[in-house]
Design a protein with these regions (language model features):
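N-terminal anchoring/stem segment of glycosyltransferases
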Residues: 1-53, 59-70
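Short beta-strand segments
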Residues: 23-24, 75, 97, 171-173
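Residues at the C-termini of beta-strands that transition into short coil/loop
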Residues: 25-27, 39-45, 97-100, 188, ...
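Short glycine-/acidic-enriched loop or helix-start segments at secondary-structure transitions
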Residues: 33, 82-85, 131
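Short, high-confidence coil segments that cap the C-terminus of an alpha-helix
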Residues: 68, 93, 192-194
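Short beta-strand-to-loop acidic/aromatic patch adjacent to the donor-nucleotide binding site
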Residues: 68-80
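Conserved donor-nucleotide/metal-binding helix-loop-beta segment in metal-dependent transferases, i.e.
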Residues: 78-112
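Catalytic core and acceptor-binding pocket of nucleotide-sugar-dependent glycosyltransferases
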Residues: 116-247
Length: 247
């Protein structure tokens, strides 16, 4: 475990004795004692980002947490600044994560949508329900209710999307090639229209990912609940924050 991962794990300790801390990993991996329980999955899911995404698009993953209403995904490049996880659970969103940017190089282009899955809160029952959907969306509902832009080019693109999602969520997730959080941010609502994704303003209060200084200013100089990718996204900024709150 790297020094940065130890920092992330130490921040997670603020939840100890308040919530169940459960790790998931392949077998024969030594897990830190901070965790209350470890769930093992096949090693094929831990080879790279793509295989990890495959696991988080599997029903069996969420069924392991069927006794919980929510799970907080906390990768070891995350930090949290408070223990108010219960507050976020009480907001009753199905999915909350740090907002994506419209352009990852130019934050001035603005935020896009929620959100990054590295530090994310997920409503277990709803995730299972979506992944067990047998049919794709109704064509006319998809066409007219999901398309604010009715231009020809947009329609052409959306027809292609519909052709794929009409095969059902099982086929779609098995053939999905992007990171799993993009499915939950962009596609899940097509299979379950009541899927409640937190709006941008709420997502920003929950977590930062890229361009933390920009996000901090946008969030009225207020820290969020946590952050993802802190050691990759202006590490100096985050180390100063950690020194201030841990003094």
């Amino acid at each position: 475990m790297t020094r940065d991962e130890k920092i992330s794990l130490n921040q997670l300790s603020r939840f100890k004795n308040k919530f169940d801390l459960i790790s998931f990993s392949p077998k024969r991996i030594t897990v830190p004692k901070i965790f209350d329980k470890t769930l093992h999955f096949e090693s094929k899911y831990f080879k790279n980002t793509s295989t990890y995404s495959r696991l988080l698009l599997e029903t069996k993953f969420y069924e392991k947490f069927a006794n919980y209403k929510f799970i907080l995904i906390y990768q070891l490049d995350c930090i949290v600044f408070s223990d108010d996880l219960k507050f976020w659970c009480n907001q009753e969103y199905d999915y909350i994560g740090a907002p994506f940017f419209r352009n990852k190089y130019f934050p001035s282009f603005g935020l896009s949508r929620v959100g990054n899955g590295g530090l994310s809160l997920r409503e277990v029952e709803i995730f299972i329900r979506i992944l067990k959907q047998k049919e794709g969306p109704n064509f006319w509902n998809f066409l007219f209710n999901k398309l604010p832009d009715k231009s020809f080019l947009n329609l052409k693109k959306r027809f292609a999307v519909y052709r794929e999602i009409s095969r059902g969520v099982k086929w779609y997730t098995e053939n999905y090639t992007l990171n799993e959080d993009l499915f939950w941010s962009d596609r899940a609502k097509l299979f379950y229209s009541n899927f409640k994704i937190a709006p941008l303003k709420v997502g920003l209060k929950f977590a930062f990912d890229m361009h933390p200084k920009f996000c901090f200013k946008r969030n009225k100089n207020t820290l969020p609940f946590g952050a993802h990718g802190w050691q990759k996204r202006d590490k100096t900024f985050w180390l100063e924050i950690l020194r201030d709150i841990n003094d």
